[in-house]
Design a protein with these regions (language model features):
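Bacterial N-terminal signal peptides that target proteins for export
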Residues: 1-10
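Secretory-pathway glycoprotein ectodomains that are cysteine- and/or Ser/Thr/Pro-rich
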Residues: 21-196
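General helical structural elements
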Residues: 9-12, 170
Length: 196
């Protein structure tokens, strides 16, 4: 088996595992505000062979965290693409966690996982409030969307996008130009955060 074919098979297996783990189970029901972001028609994460795919994973296989516990993310695309990662908590408060102050470029190489935080670096993302936290992973072959160029204000690590997810979802879709010559893909994970 050639190295290229082996890499494609490995990515497909990783994507299938991520899709199986990335579903929202009964115990991880999204709020209406989170569901709006999860339902954006950006593009499937499992497009036919040759299409852009994005897979996100976390360091806890069961997707369960305690408040204050660090969350380590990994993201991978099957072709060079611009990537954004959104975190949406239960009340709809949405944060752009990638790109961020430490990682200003949204461009990822094909089949090279990005780890947040970098190995050996201090934690960047923590489980903040009890309930379900949604992570939405977005990729596009064009990088002209504001989603890939947004800079955090002041000394913050991340950009806060507000709580009006319906307006935000519409703005994201318009900015990505979904269906107008740009390949796009999305996937998501729902995490359970416990307060005890």
């Amino acid at each position: 088996m050639s190295a290229g074919r082996l890499a494609r098979v490995a990515l497909a297996l990783w994507a299938a595992a991520g899709a199986a783990c990335g579903g929202v189970g009964d115990s991880e029901r999204l709020t209406d505000a989170q569901q709006v972001i999860a339902d954006m028609k950006i593009g499937p994460s499992d497009q036919q062979r040759g299409g852009l795919t994005i897979v996100g994973a976390v360091d806890h296989a069961d997707h369960r965290y305690h408040v204050g516990e660090p969350i380590n993310l990994s993201i991978q695309v099957n072709q060079a693409a611009y990537v954004a990662v959104l975190r949406v908590i239960s009340n709809g408060a949405t944060t752009l966690v990638f790109p961020n102050r430490r990682h200003t470029s949204a461009l990822l190489a094909a089949n090279v996982p990005l780890h947040l935080p970098d190995p050996g670096a201090p934690a960047m993302i923590a489980a903040e409030t009890p309930g379900v936290a949604l992570f939405e992973f977005v990729a596009a072959t064009r990088g002209d969307s504001w989603l890939f160029n947004r800079k955090p204000l002041t000394a913050a690590d991340f950009s806060e996008l507000g709580t009006t997810t319906r307006t935000l979802a519409k703005d994201i879709l318009l900015s990505l130009r979904v269906g107008h010559g740009t390949e796009t893909a999305a996937s998501h994970l729902a995490l359970r955060v416990r307060g005890d």
